[in-house]
From Swiss-Prot:
Role summary: Ubiquitin-protein ligase that probably functions as an E3 ligase in conjunction with specific E1 and E2 ligases. May also function as an E4 ligase mediating the assembly of polyubiquitin chains on substrates ubiquitinated by another E3 ubiquitin ligase. May regulate myosin assembly in striated muscles together with STUB1 and VCP/p97 by targeting myosin chaperone UNC45B for proteasomal degradation.
Main location: cytoplasm
Source species: Homo sapiens
EC top class, as a word: transferase
Any one cellular-component term (Gene Ontology): cytoplasm
Stated name of the protein: Ubiquitin conjugation factor E4 B
Pathway: Protein modification; protein ubiquitination
């Protein structure tokens, strides 16, 4: 294509301007030409052939276009691909920089976690071979670029590229470049000896630029980079005649190099999402403002600006430029420049942030995507004498979390500090230069792929990084100590560094240990400080985590330099100085700050205040907010995993990481206690975050690589308390077994990582999720109690509102409501943190892994387990801590109640098998309360209790191992729980038996268990003991519940008589009301248990009768039934009439129906005799009253009533017969009397102790307790010896007595 003349270029450009176009034509020019700005045309001639490719070193001065601020970009100049100096309007620098910053920013993609997980070798260690993610990205980036084509880039073009990236010139001073006076002098003296190679030139350029900034006090060298109000005119003055400049419609920008109006209006608009006010065209004289306290929005306007009046063309162009958007990519904070004291301050009409404080303040780093708008008061003029190193700060608001919307600056306490000093501007310059290299590579991949250009760009990057290291050390200004904050932290927190910048900084400095420490220790300290000040009330909390995560992931070869540095910090694992070692570790250790973010109200009150303190918290709002908070937690925990995983991958720090993990576990052992002082242990949020990371580390572990005896290993990192309860062994048993196992063996082999990680994760569950669950349940209980108190106070208001205690009751009601509101909000936070279904599923899957390990210990043939197990309990299993089993039960109990949908996972089948195996082999567990917990889990999954777990319960009852052994095992436990060894055993047994009875009712409906039930019914001894316990429980429960109903009736009657009630003293009234409340609780509880027990009787007597008629059971059963009939229908039955009987679960008609059904189902001569022999409760009138009530209330059919009447008549006949044949045996000799009951023996037997008792009496005792009643030694029925001689003597005496009486 022919080259265009200067007149043709000028004509076309004026035509475009006249048409209102601001973009350039896309037709590339054959040689670099430059357009002129509006106004008087500037003569230009077409360059000669030698000038067509770039800048002549000897007679031309390179200059760059003001990339970024001025809105001027370069356009494609050559068909050979020299497009590094150009940009079309559709591919403006802003678009490219935004794209680059988003696609190549420091953000790690979501797959990185999974990729890093795939590198775990759990057999030999955590790392086998790993390819760095950054290396993969770089290779992928390079492979995407097109291969080099066309002629090689000349030296002139290379110089032009260098000058463009560094924005320098060494010939003419210009507003758009930094003039290098030293280089200019050298070029004038001997141009050929200025530099030996490009590396040398780059170093000279950077050093001169940076030294200029340090040596000039009243002039800022970077001020020349701030575009004027007429960027095209400025470009026209550029000494580089080969550059074609234009005013793009979407120019690339930089917050460092922007025009006054552009920065004032648009930069803050982009940074804070505020709407910029229109920028007026006034560029005349304005008052001078001091630099130190200037508003951040005017920082750029304090750079040196020519004070000469601008031409009309300039003003017009400046107005247009002022409306250009400005990117905030590399300036997370707007700072005040110390060189602006002599310049003219151009006031911006945009809203300005709050005034800068005179003392350093922490400033929150911002998200580059979403920021709330904010305005602040204008700043007063400041004295020009403010020092240049005076620190100032600016609040940068993070983007909001779940609630969205804007927020005032003062609502954020997250803040950081950045000094407004020369180092900041030097860093801005170096970061911009580094980023422009990437922009050039993206714009011109063909040219940049040429080896020479690629090497040049690599040198530029390296030199930028090297000089950044010098700046960070203070080598160019004042040396900095390790305690001073790093200038780089704010950029990292804002995610504003170019891709690869921080990695290159690590690569460049890590080989010099001192330099590396001097640069990165302040960075690490700054990130930790940022993490401490973060909260989940905004999404800013993740940025310190992301920054540290990326630092830790940076590796070179097999070394992670930052991981080495982190693990070498003095506070990596500080020694404990107080009893509160758990809280100390969280507060003082380096990683503690990063693991501490939490949604729990007791950990972070800001979360509950922001999300759950509205006037009306609806269920839907709470659900949405909870999901958002759970998403935040997931993001933060993923970053924590990257950090700890990187430290583990690094071979040099793996031991330190494992030591830290073990220290967290060991320091928080007290969290497992039922009552814990929260001040001494880590917070729930910290522990759950720690648990989540360990779960991720354990995901790929195979059980074949886990040593189940690790907890007994001499080099085990976990310290168990000496009093830790074992599954089925005492500490003496454990010590003896360990001596036997390891006493004569050679030294132990080192534990492998999979084993250590598995057990650390197991103990982390014990110390995190389960204490949190217990706290959650306690909170729910407190909410219920407060609700009940509030309801009682409201319901009884009519009784106390006119009493002297009215004021006290109102205050109590107010306090209860306030506390209730607080607890409900705390519960909402806990719902978000604890009821996260995905998190609960992870816990369940890990417990599934634990169950597999336990089942392998119980039976090596797993999964082909056969029951019953070997009678000898494996010593490994017996010696394990009891909570290994208990935690499984507790966690299942929790999710069945509060998140049953999380129950169905692939591991569910193993969980079902484990429950069945443990319940069918109760001898494997020493603690009966642990077996009771497993029973309670099965009870809770019963469809009658939790309909959503029906499938799980069906898996249990239909499991092949359960059909034969589950029913007998539960029946045995029903009787064994009579004696648990605890002081509360008498009351505990009722709840446990209630659970078993409910399970039996469900199993009875399953045809697969019918045969087992019938076998048990007919087997004799076991079932007889079971029936005896049923009789005992029914007797006690019905008696207690009916007695409590009588007391309730009595108090209610007193309170109905208001006059009599008011005459009672106040303390007596309170005592009666307190007794009423207690009786109501007791009656509700006991009636529920009694109803279940009677239901069981009703079912059993319908199926089988013979066991109930045994001599040791029949009379007791008949006496129990007669007594309860007397309670329900006797002369005092009216005492059971209470208000709202359904409130207590009292259904007298149903109870009478069931009791009379039991009579009918056991109707036979033997049972009739047992009824007649009960002289305590039976009477003819009682049975007549029962028949009358059943007829009157229609409780039974006529046929059933007639059958009951026939039974009553049969019993009455036996009573009359007994009366006629009654013989008095009260004068029997003492040797014929039973020593326990003092009645005449009919079948004497000798106990091992030598005592002689009646067989029926001792058998009845053995049903309750298998011990000798006189010395408490173990006693069974087989140990009883008949005494036939004594029996014959007793019978002879009885015959003699009968004959004498007649």
């Amino acid at each position: 294509m022919e080259e265009l003349s200067a007149d043709e270029i000028r004509r076309r450009r004026l035509a475009r301007l006249a048409g209102g176009q601001t973009s350039q034509p896309t037709t590339p020019l054959t040689s670099p030409q430059r357009e002129n700005p509006p106004g008087p045309p500037i003569a230009a001639s077409a360059p000669g052939p030698s000038q067509s490719l770039g800048l002549n070193v000897h007679n031309m001065t390179p200059a760059t276009s003001p990339i970024g601020a001025s809105g001027v970009a370069h356009r494609s100049q050559s068909s050979e691909g020299v497009s590094s100096l150009s940009s079309s309007p559709s591919n403006s620098l802003e678009t490219q920089s935004q794209s680059l910053s988003r696609s190549q920013s420091m953000d790690i993609d979501g797959v990185s976690c999974e990729k890093s997980m795939s590198q775990v070798d759990v057999d030999s260690g955590i790392e086998n071979m790993e390819v760095d993610e950054n290396d993969r990205r770089e290779k992928r980036s390079l492979s995407d670029k097109e291969p080099s084509s066309g002629p090689e880039v000349s030296e002139e073009q290379a110089l032009q590229l260098v000058c463009k990236i560094f924005r320098v010139s060494w010939k003419d001073r210009d507003r758009d470049v930094i003039f290098l006076s030293s280089l200019s002098a050298q070029f004038k003296q001997n141009p050929k000896e200025v530099f030996s190679d490009f590396k040398d030139l780059i170093g000279q350029i950077l050093m001169e630029v940076l030294m200029m900034s340090t040596q000039t006090r009243d002039e800022n060298p970077f001020a020349s980079l701030t575009a004027t109000s007429q960027p095209i005119a400025a470009a026209a003055r550029s000494p580089d005649r080969n550059l074609l400049l234009n005013t793009g419609s979407n120019p690339g920008t930089s917050p460092m190099f922007c025009s006054v109006a552009s920065f004032g209006a648009s930069s803050l608009s982009s940074l804070y999402e505020s709407s910029p006010a229109p920028t007026p065209s006034f560029w005349s004289s304005v008052p001078v403002m001091g630099p130190s306290l200037a508003s951040p929005s005017r920082a750029a306007s304090q750079l040196a600006v020519p004070s000469t009046p601008l031409s009309p063309h300039s003003a017009a162009s400046g107005t247009a430029a002022g409306s250009q958007p400005s990117s905030p990519r590399y300036r997370p904070y707007t700072v005040t420049h110390p060189w602006a004291s002599s310049g003219v301050s151009i006031l911006s009409s945009s809203p300005s942030p709050p005034a800068l404080a005179s003392s350093p303040q922490a400033v929150p780093a911002s998200s580059s995507r979403q920021r709330p708008s904010s305005t602040g008061p204008p700043l007063p003029p400041a004295s020009p004498s403010a020092t240049s190193r005076r620190p100032s700060s600016l609040r940068i608001s993070p983007s909001l979390g779940a609630s969205g919307g804007a927020s005032n600056w003062d609502s954020y306490s997250d803040h950081f500090t950045i000094e407004t000093c020369k180092e900041t501007d030097m860093l801005n310059y170096l970061i911009e230069c580094f980023d422009r290299v990437g922009i050039e590579e993206k714009k011109a991949p063909k040219m940049c792929s040429q080896p020479a250009v690629s090497q040049l760009l690599s040198n530029i990057r390296s030199q930028c990084i090297s000089h950044t290291a010098l700046v960070l050390q203070g080598s160019l200004t004042q040396p900095r100590s390790l305690q001073q904050p790093s200038f780089l932290v704010p950029y990292m927190l804002c995610r504003n560094l170019p891709y690869g910048f921080i990695q290159e900084l690590v690569r460049t400095t890590h080989q010099d240990e001192e330099v590396f420490k001097q640069i990165f220790i302040p960075i690490l300290q700054g990130l930790a400080l940022a993490a401490k000040e973060c909260s989940l009330d905004s999404d800013y909390f993740k940025y310190p985590l992301m920054a540290l995560g990326e630092l830790c992931e940076t590796k070179f070869g097999k070394t992670h330099p930052v991981c080495n540095l982190v693990a070498s910090l003095r506070l990596w694992l500080p020694k404990s100085l107080s009893p509160g070692c758990g809280r100390e570790l969280q507060r003082l250790s380096y990683l503690g700050a990063f693991f501490s973010f939490s949604v729990f109200a007791e950990d972070d009150v800001k979360v509950v205040e922001k999300y759950f303190s509205g006037p009306a918290i609806t269920l839907e709002n709470t659900r949405v907010v909870s999901q958002s908070l759970q998403h935040y937690l997931e993001l933060g925990r993923q970053e924590l995993f990257k950090i700890l995983h990187s430290i583990l991958l690094n071979g040099e720090t793996r031991e330190a990481a494992l030591s830290y993990m073990a220290a967290v576990v060991n320091a928080n052992m007290k969290k497992a206690q039922m009552q814990t002082d929260d001040r001494l242990v880590s917070t729930d949020g910290f522990m759950l975050n720690f648990l989540w990371v360990l779960q991720q580390l354990s995901t790929k572990i195979k059980l074949e690589t886990v040593d189940p005896t690790y907890i007994f290993h001499p080099r085990c990192r976990i310290t168990l308390p000496n009093d830790e309860t074992r599954v089925n062994a005492t500490m003496e048993d454990v010590n003896d077994w360990l001596t036997e196992l390891y006493g004569d063996q050679p030294p132990f082999s080192e534990p492998k990582f999979p084993t250590e990680c598995f057990f650390l994760t197991l103990h982390a569950h014990h110390l995190s999720i389960l204490p949190s669950c217990r706290r959650y349940i306690r909170r729910l209980r407190a909410i219920r109690e407060l609700n009940r108190t509030v309801e009682d106070l409201k319901n009884n208001e009519s009784q106390w509102k006119d009493s002297p205690l009215a004021t006290r009751h109102r205050e109590m009601l107010k306090r209860c409501k306030t506390q209730l509101k607080k607890l409900v909000r705390c519960k909402a936070c806990a719902d978000a943190g604890l009821l996260d279904e995905s998190f609960l599923r992870r816990c369940l899957n890990f417990y599934g892994l634990l169950i597999q390990l336990l089942l392998r210990i119980l039976d090596p043939a797993y999964p082909d387990i056969t029951l019953p197990l070997n009678s000898d309990v494996p010593k490994v299993f017996a010696a394990l801590p009891e909570f290994y089993v208990e935690d499984v039960a507790e966690f299942l109990f929790f999710i069945v109640q509060y998140s049953p949908q999380a129950l169905y996972e692939p591991c569910t089948q193993d969980i079902v098998m484990f429950l069945v195996v443990m319940l069918c082999n109760q001898n494997y567990i020493r603690n009966p309360y642990l077996v009771a917990k497993l029973v309670e889990v099965m009870f809770m999954t019963n469809p009658a209790v939790q309909p959503r777990t029906q499938k799980f319960f069906e898996m249990i009852e239909n499991h092949p191992l359960s059909t034969k052994l589950l029913v007998p095992s539960l029946m045995k436990f029903y009787t064994d729980v009579e004696h648990t060894g605890a002081t509360s055993e008498f009351y505990d047994k009722f709840t446990i038996r209630y659970h078993i009875s409910t399970i039996f009712k469900s199993l009875w409906q399953n045809i697969a268990h019918h045969g087992t039930f019938m076998e048990e019914f007919n087997s004799g001894k076991q079932f007889v003991r079971y029936i005896n316990m049923l009789i005992n429980d029914t007797t006690f429960l019905l008696d207690e519940s009916l007695e409590s109903l009588k007391r309730i009736h009595e108090v209610q009657e007193e309170m109905k008589n208001k006059e009599q009630w008011d005459q009672l003293p106040r303390d007596q009234q309170q005592a009666r009301q307190s007794q009423l409340a207690q009786d109501e609780r007791v009656s509700r509880s006991y009636l529920a248990l009694a109803t279940e027990t009677v239901d069981m009787f009703h079912i059993l007597t319908k199926q089988v009768q013979k066991p109930f008629l045994r001599p040791e059971l029949g009379p007791r059963l008949a006496a129990m039934l007669n007594f309860n009939l007397q309670q329900l229908c006797g002369p005092k039955c009216r005492d059971l009439k209470v208000e709202n009987p359904e409130k207590y679960g009292f259904e007298p008609k149903k109870l009478l129906d069931q009791l009379t059904d039991i009579y009918l189902q056991l109707d036979c001569a033997r049972f009739a005799k047992a009824i007649a022999d009960d002289q305590r409760s039976y009477s003819k009138e009682l049975f007549e009253e029962v028949i009358s009530k059943m007829r009157k209330a229609g409780i039974k059919s006529t046929i059933a009533i007639e059958k009951f009447k026939l039974l009553a008549e049969k019993v009455e006949e036996i009573v009359a017969k007994n009366a006629r044949a009654e013989i008095d045996y009260s004068d029997a000799p003492d040797e014929f009397r039973d020593p326990l009951m003092d009645t005449l023996m009919t079948d004497p037997v000798r106990l091992p102790s030598g005592t002689i008792m009646d067989r029926s009496i001792i058998l009845r005792h053995l049903l309750n307790s298998p011990t000798d009643p006189f010395n408490r030694q173990t006693l069974t029925e087989s140990m009883l010896e008949p005494v036939p001689e004594l029996k014959e003597q007793i019978q002879a005496w009885m015959r003699e007595k009968q004959n004498s009486d007649h």
